[in-house]
Amino acid sequence: MFDFLTSLQTYRQEAAQAAQYIGQGFGVTFDHMSRRPITIHYPYEKLIPSERFRGRIHFEFDKCIACEVCVRVCPINLPVVDWDYQKSVKKKQLRSYSIDFGVCIFCGNCVEYCPTNCLSMTEEYELSVYDRHELNFDHVALGRVPTSVVQDTLVTPVLGLGYLPKGELSSLP
C-alpha cells in the first residue's frame, strides 16, 4: 500500500515539474511574440548601416603614392598594386590598383594604415554577382562614387534593427 502511495507522490512531483518546464517554455514564446520582428522586406526596405560599417572599399587614384602599405598589412596580401618607377622625377607612378572582393575579408587594415587616406570603407553591402570574376574590382570600379541607401527613392530606409527589449511592439509605425 505504501509503495503505491510513494509512486503516486513521485508521479505528481514529476508531473508538476514537467508542467513547470512547459510553462517556462510558453513564457519565453509569448515574450518573443510581443517583440518587434527582426526581418525586413528586403528589396523594398533596406537597412541603414552604422557609421563604423565596413562595406565596399572606395579608392581615390590621384591620392595613391604606390607605397604598397595596404598590401603589407593585408592578412591575405590581397590588393594588387602595379606601378612604374619614373627616373626623371624619382617617383613611383601608379598604373593600376585592384581588389578582389570575392577574397577580401573586409578587415579594414588597408584603410586604417594608408598614409594618404586614398582608401575608405563605404556603406555599400550589395556586392552579389552571378560570376565571381566580376568581384575583381580595378581602380576604375573602386573609384566609383558609393551609393547611399537614403538616396534611393524606391526604397524605404530602416534604421538598424537590434534585438529589442520587451514592450517595443507598441512603438511600431
Curated annotation (Swiss-Prot):
**Domain (4Fe-4S ferredoxin-type) ranges:** 55-84, 95-124
Keyword terms, alphabetized: 4Fe-4S, Chloroplast, Iron, Iron-sulfur, Membrane, Metal-binding, NAD, NADP, Plastid, Plastoquinone, Quinone, Repeat, Thylakoid, Translocase
- Identify this protein by name: NAD(P)H-quinone oxidoreductase subunit I, chloroplastic
Q: Which residues cross the membrane?
A: none
EC numbers: 7.1.1.-
Gene designation:
ndhI
Q: Give residues annotated as binding [4Fe-4S] cluster 2.
A: C74, C104, C107, C110
Question: Which organism is this protein's natural source?
Answer: Nephroselmis olivacea
Membrane topology field: Peripheral membrane protein
Names of the cofactor(s):
[4Fe-4S] cluster
UniProt GO MF annotations:
4 iron, 4 sulfur cluster binding; iron ion binding; NADH dehydrogenase (ubiquinone) activity; quinone binding
The note on cofactor binding and number reads:
Binds 2 [4Fe-4S] clusters per subunit.
